[in-house]
Amino acid sequence: LSVASYFFDDDGVLAKDTQIIKDGILVAGLSDLASATQLGTVPTGNGRRESCRRKAYARMTNTFFEKGTDKLEDMIASIKHGYMLFETSNGMEDPKNWAIQCVAQYGIEIVDGKLTDNYVSPVVMSGYVPDLLKSISMISDDFEISGAGSCGKGYKEWVRVSDGGPALKARVKLG
């Protein structure tokens, strides 16, 4: 459990784990009671609102990738040139066009499989979600959850969330 955990969502639906992707296939989305009814699916228990004066929206809670089997050192060693990114925040998605953007507070350059002393900050990542997910080639065996985030919708509609998981080796557009 984390600061974003709850037993019932704000629609009164029992909270449960929702596996979004399984074996590389999108198997479920997050829903609140209204969206599940409209789509003819079972609600996932993700209807959350900032306060009783606000509308419930489908929101993330504790969102993460499950750990893999790769050692972080092996992942770094496999990279000819790239960046290891840290402290991601400010994620934003476009559900209609499958675009994503988020910010890492800093990155460390990797050259010939070794971390360098070259730091960059901040780092903006962007891309097309299916391409990003398909590009994941390694997943570390470590796992860490951070509970200090929030998910925003509409005008000043914030709820607490956690995210994290293992390190991922993927191709993303940096700016």
Model regions and ranges:
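N-terminal small-residue-enriched
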Residues: 1-175
